[in-house]
């Protein structure tokens, strides 16, 4: 089986399964192969071997960790190309044994790097030193932490993590993520912060390899450069969560995975400016025809509209599973008021799907 036929198989399976389980919906017919996109034969495969899913992503259970580093030096790094610092993770493994894993860590990001007391972090593990631990084969995950040291910031992180979980339910063409409960310990002073929830998500280049391609670093991809089926799912997800702070053209909060076939698969990430999270610091681009972050705006290209009905069936099929995320052990970490508001926001989205033409008319690229 070629890479092209394999990638197509995974995408088609996702859409067909979604359609088959959607209540009172007809099973959509398979589209002709006009998109030329194929899914990887094995979505857990890494380059050169058939490795299993790394331990870090194989479990959904929150992971208790302590990060020991020179926190003062680390947190004062506010430049785009900050240096790595030596650090270590300690945790208790499944057998109850304490584990310590050395790593390198540095700050990264744009808005959160400049404005947050706790900037996002990029982690870098040595596979040799991480062998036998939960971080073996994790490579270079990113860490999203509460922006400030307050309860609202921690709730924002939990809300954003839920969106990564939803995206993974919808499509494997998304970042894997894992919730953590982390304690930051300063190696210089011996002092430790209060533990807080954060999450790790898959490195973009690692994700691209998993999907059978490479990360596209050249900006400027237009509507004809994106696979329309995958783009329809990505844009519908952004519409669902009320996110307008992204651009696949500009590679801003959106990535492209380039396949050997020439196809480009858009993948969304970074959702703290979305209406679903509704952070106090989120704003709307004044050039857009909306005033509040909770307002939804369709930002897809018009040439992808034909692929939207199949994408809608996938979202409908996952509705129960999506709602269930807010009553499981992780969902219960959210405040009841946030759960109520979020489910009402999803209710509104699913009602809009009944009249998709209303929002598709605002597509970009009309003649």
Predicted regions and their residues:
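Bacterial N-terminal signal peptides that target proteins for export
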Residues: 1-10
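Generic alpha-helical structural signal
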Residues: 18-19, 263
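Phosphate/dinucleotide-binding and metal-coordinating scaffold of catalytic cores
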Residues: 25-367
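Sec/Tat signal peptide C-region and signal peptidase I cleavage site
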Residues: 20-24
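Bacterial N-terminal signal peptides
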Residues: 9-18
């Amino acid at each position: 089986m070629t890479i092209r036929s394999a990638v197509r198989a995974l995408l088609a399976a996702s859409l067909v399964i979604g359609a088959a389980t959607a209540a009172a919906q007809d099973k959509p017919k398979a589209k002709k192969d006009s998109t030329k996109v194929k899914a990887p034969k094995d979505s857990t495969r890494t380059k050169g071997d058939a490795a299993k899913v790394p331990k870090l992503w194989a479990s959904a259970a929150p992971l208790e960790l302590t990060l020991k580093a020179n926190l003062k030096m680390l947190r004062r790094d506010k430049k785009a190309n900050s240096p790595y610092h030596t650090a270590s993770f300690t945790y208790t493994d499944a057998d109850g044994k304490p584990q310590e894993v050395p790593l390198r860590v540095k700050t990264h990001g744009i808005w959160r790097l400049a404005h947050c007391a706790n900037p996002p972090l990029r982690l870098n593990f040595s596979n040799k030193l991480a062998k036998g631990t939960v971080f073996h084969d994790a490579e270079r995950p990113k860490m999203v932490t509460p922006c400030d040291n307050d309860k609202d910031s921690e709730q924002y992180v939990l809300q954003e993590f839920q969106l990564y979980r939803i995206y993974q339910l919808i499509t494997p063409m998304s970042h894997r993520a894992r919730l953590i409960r982390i304690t930051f310990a300063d190696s210089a002073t011996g002092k430790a912060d209060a533990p807080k929830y954060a999450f790790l998500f898959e490195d973009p280049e690692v994700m691209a390899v998993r999907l059978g391609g490479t990360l596209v670093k050249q900006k400027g991809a237009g509507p004809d450069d994106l696979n329309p089926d995958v783009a329809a799912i990505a844009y519908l997800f952004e519409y669902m969560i009320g996110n307008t702070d992204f651009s696949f053209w500009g590679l801003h909060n959106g990535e492209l995975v380039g396949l050997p076939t020439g196809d480009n698969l858009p993948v969304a990430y970074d959702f703290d400016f979305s209406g679903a999270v509704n952070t106090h610091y989120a704003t709307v681009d004044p050039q857009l025809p909306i005033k509040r972050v909770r307002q939804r705006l369709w930002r897809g290209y018009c040439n992808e509209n034909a692929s939207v009905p199949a994408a809608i069936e996938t979202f409908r099929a996952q509705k129960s599973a999506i709602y269930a995320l807010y009553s499981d052990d992780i969902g219960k970490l959210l405040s009841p008021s946030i759960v109520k508001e979020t489910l009402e926001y999803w209710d509104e989205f699913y009602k809009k799907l009944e009249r998709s033409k209303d929002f598709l008319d605002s597509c970009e690229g009309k003649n």
